[in-house]
Amino acid sequence: MLDIRFVRESPDVVRADLRKRNDLEKLAWVDDLLAKDSQARAMQVKVDELRRRRNEISREINEARKAGKDTSALMAEARDIPRQIKEAETEMEESRNKVHYYLMRLPNILDDSVPVGKDDTENVEVKRWGEPVQKDFEIKNHGLLAVEHGWADFERAAKVAGAGFYFLKGNMVLLDMALQRFAMDLLVKRGFTPVTPPYMMNRKSYEGVTDLADFEKVMYKIEGDDMYLIATSEHPIGAMYQGEIFEEKDLPLRLAGISPCFRREIGAHGLDTKGLFRVHQFHKIEQFVFCKPEDSWKIHEEILANAEAVFQQLGLPYHVVNICTGDIGTVAAKKYDIEVWMPRENTYKEVVSCSNCTAYQATRLNIKVRDPKDFESKRYVHTLNSTAIATSRAMRAILENNQQKDGSVLIPEVLRPYMNGLEYL
């Protein structure tokens, strides 16, 4: 969330950002937020003054009694102070709650390099790598191809769990595992520490990493518990150090999460409806970095380069897009997507999201870094995250781009050591 001090000092920056996002509803919140904040602070002053007066009256009553003076007026005032304090505290709490409500829902301040646009059609391409694959035969649907070869079973998975699930079998399981291990090994060589997080989170922690008002509809809630299945390892790793203070020497902290991911909402989009691209459960390797504020933009480019290296070494053509104001969401100050070439649809499809969240998550979670020259001086860290690989989407890309005329699939060379030297699926 935004720091209330920033909103107080720079309300016009907040308003300009919301206009850039064309978020008129939240733009209308800013004046009320400032008014409620002012009211809460005024009530705090009033409460402090009433408490001071309460102590002062006690002394005055004692002195009056010693002097044999009438204390009835002072006693009446003293009896009324608790009521006044309670009223002021109630008003203060109501105002603070409203301020907190607004702050938890206002989006991050966008970087100036984020393009203005209404939706994903106005994202801006910034880079291409590789030549889009063109085949001289009709490419089979990856889901049907997987079923034909006995690599996947969607029908039986639907009987067991419903639509959007799958059984992987045989060499497809090895491919899934190979992709995870390949991506993790790449990150470890680049200074990341592997992390297996809890696969469930409580609501308080989840509210720290994302706006549940936007995100809750895509998540699985555990009935009867204040717990959710994770949608990505980014979320538990982001909340891992909540309420803690880093020393500068320990930053940047580069973590590589490995986990299954669970998503309720998968959509229904043409050729994606049966297969591995839009599913309720998949495996993902995620990059997450805690760093000093002055380092975050350099690290944003670094984690993008890591994700690009994954797809370059897999030999899968892709492009990078700079996500526009109408598509970026609440948390990121800037986001890149990598979209890989899908030759059957003759288009690029998203496989990586790479975000610099600046201090937005750290403010919600109260994660700071201490100034090494001033023990009492602390500031919020910056957090960044990026997919390294989501295996279900990468497998679809491999099944399409590397599909052969006879229906076999060429395994990317970098994965073969993880698959017992197998060359073709």
UniProtKB/Swiss-Prot annotation:
Query: Where would you find this protein in the cell?
Result: Cytoplasm
- Tell me the residue numbers annotated for binding L-serine: 232-234, 286, 387
Q: Which GO terms describe its molecular function?
A: ATP binding; serine-tRNA ligase activity
According to its UniProt record, the EC number is 6.1.1.11
Among InterPro entries, the record links this protein to: aa-tRNA-synt_IIb, aa-tRNA-synth_II, aa-tRNA-synth_II/BPL/LPL, Ser-tRNA-ligase_type_1, Ser-tRNA-synth_1_N, SerRS_1_N_sf, SerRS_core, tRNA-bd_arm
Q: Which CDD domains match?
A: SerRS_core
Q: Which reaction does it catalyse?
A: tRNA(Ser) + L-serine + ATP = L-seryl-tRNA(Ser) + AMP + diphosphate + H(+); tRNA(Sec) + L-serine + ATP = L-seryl-tRNA(Sec) + AMP + diphosphate + H(+)
List UniProt keywords, sorted A-Z: Aminoacyl-tRNA synthetase, ATP-binding, Cytoplasm, Ligase, Nucleotide-binding, Protein biosynthesis
State whether it acts alone or in a complex, and with which partners, per the record.
Answer: Homodimer. The tRNA molecule binds across the dimer.
What does the domain comment read?
Consists of two distinct domains, a catalytic core and a N-terminal extension that is involved in tRNA binding.
Record's protein name? Serine--tRNA ligase
Organism of derivation: Methanocella arvoryzae (strain DSM 22066 / NBRC 105507 / MRE50)
